[in-house]
């Protein structure tokens, strides 16, 4: 088999066999196939696309290029959730203890965040003493006993994806549905998931700006999952404004605690219940999405979800008293109100810009080596559709420096107030095939 033949075959719009895809991935990981040939094939895929069989084969070739996490010692169906990323996305912190409270095992591998705020692990490390460096045996034991544990990413998972992702980044082949879908799904499958729930974001603060693109990606990932024996569902949710009200690590953790108490923002609560219902159904703990939702609402109302979060924190060395004493979380030195310059209705909150503003305060990382300030960030006091009076606070800046002129300047261009009401949509579609 020759790589040049595979490139030409895809260039001319033909279907690659599983053997050809395996030959490419194996050779590329070993270093036998050079970057220039790999980038040539990536560009051919970009223009000619791949069918469902090719996408599934590419995904599994990437899964098989490295280690796979074995979660077979954990009882029950392990359901993993993946979000394509957004601003203020606190869902994992709420979902993990919530679905665990209705007997769904959550064995979560998480990374540290690059971008606007930290990842799930950074947020959890805002809790004094919380640690994620636990060995596999302890991880399995904690999930079996309490249904939920979070561990830092380890092992050599999907090396082919890491290599191909870096190549796509510099060759103009990032925005390709088969390449994005196989990249995301290979990581989830390698991490040991039996079933997968996907939250595909669309809008100004999302990777997929249009609903059409988000739908294409969601269908692609659901089909890959189902084709390789992992029950998969997706929802398409809106990221034209940040989710919830908090953007920042300790601030988002506080918001997660409020949501588990039943006092969280409406949009975050609704998204969590929608995603959680799918997880409960896929884990065979309810027959319908309606039944699953009722179980989750009961877990919040009874306090079971909050109790589960407390035990989870305690199990991993954290100070669980932060649940009842949120003032023990890292606090920023200064709270600065950003006020409306005129009266009207909020019609636009540019997610990315607000995320960048939060990053400028120190809430996120530009490189893996950067330190994060867990206390800082932004809390939205108004969201799209809300009425606002001139001089009223639109948001609160939590900062450890007094001079935030650069942040204010960024925010000036990210908020629009007009004299008409806009009603945002939170959940656009649910995709099951």
UniProtKB/Swiss-Prot annotation:
One of its GO terms (molecular function) is thymidine phosphorylase activity. It comes from the Bacteria. Keywords: Glycosyltransferase, Metal-binding, Potassium, Transferase. K(+) binds at residues 88, 90, 243, 246, 255. Phosphate binds at residues 81-83, 92, 108-110, 120. PROSITE patterns: THYMID_PHOSPHORYLASE (PS00647). Binds 1 K(+) ion per subunit. Coiled coil: none annotated. Belongs to the thymidine/pyrimidine-nucleoside phosphorylase family. Catalyzes phosphorolysis of the pyrimidine nucleosides uridine, thymidine and 2'-deoxyuridine with the formation of the corresponding pyrimidine base and ribose-1-phosphate. Homodimer. This is Pyrimidine-nucleoside phosphorylase. It comes from Staphylococcus aureus (strain MSSA476). The gene is pdp.
């Amino acid at each position: 088999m020759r790589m040049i033949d595979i490139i030409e075959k895809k260039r001319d719009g033909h279907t690659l066999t599983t053997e050809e895809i395996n030959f490419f991935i194996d050779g590329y990981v070993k270093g036998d196939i050079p970057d220039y040939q790999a980038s040539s094939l990536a560009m051919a895929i970009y223009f000619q696309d791949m069918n469902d069989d090719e996408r599934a084969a590419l995904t599994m070739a990437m899964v098989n290029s490295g280690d796979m996490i074995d979660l077979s010692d954990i009882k029950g169906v392990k359901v993993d959730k993946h979000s394509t990323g957004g601003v203020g996305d606190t869902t994992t912190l709420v979902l993990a203890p919530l679905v665990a409270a209705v007997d769904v095992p959550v064995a979560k591998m998480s990374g540290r965040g690059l971008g606007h705020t930290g990842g799930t692990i950074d947020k959890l490390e805002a809790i004094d003493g919380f640690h994620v460096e636990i060995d596999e045996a302890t991880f399995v034991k904690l999930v079996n006993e309490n249904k939920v544990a979070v561990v830092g990413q380890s092992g050599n998972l999907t090396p082919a994806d890491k290599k191909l992702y870096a190549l796509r980044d510099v060759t103009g082949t990032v925005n390709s549905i088969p390449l994005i879908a196989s990249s995301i799904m290979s990581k989830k499958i390698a991490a040991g998931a039996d079933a997968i729930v996907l939250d595909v974001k669309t809008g100004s603060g999302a990777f997929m700006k249009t609903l059409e693109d988000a739908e294409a990606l969601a269908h692609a990932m659901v089909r890959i999952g189902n084709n390789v024996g992992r029950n998969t569902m997706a929802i398409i949710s809106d990221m034209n404004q940040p989710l919830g009200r908090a953007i920042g690590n300790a601030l988002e953790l506080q918001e997660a605690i409020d949501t588990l108490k039943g006092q969280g923002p409406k949009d975050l609560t609704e998204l969590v219940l929608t995603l959680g219902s799918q997880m409960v159904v896929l884990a065979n703990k309810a027959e319908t999405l309606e039944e699953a939702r009722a179980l989750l609402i009961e877990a919040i109302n009874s306090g079971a979800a909050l109790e589960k979060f407390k035990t989870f924190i305690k199990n991993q060395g954290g100070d669980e008293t932060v649940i009842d004493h949120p003032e023990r979380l890292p606090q920023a030195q200064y709270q600065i109100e950003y006020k409306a310059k005129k009266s009207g209705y909020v019609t636009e909150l540019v997610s990315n810009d607000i995320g960048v503003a939060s990053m400028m305060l120190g809430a996120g990382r530009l490189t893996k080596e950067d330190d994060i300030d867990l206390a800082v960030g932004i809390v939205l006091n108004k969201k799209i559709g809300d009425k606002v009076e001139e001089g009223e606070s639109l948001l609160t800046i939590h900062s450890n420096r007094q001079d935030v002129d650069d942040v204010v300047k960024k925010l000036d261009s990210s908020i629009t107030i007009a004299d008409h009401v806009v009603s945002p949509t939170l959940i656009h579609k649910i995709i099951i095939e």
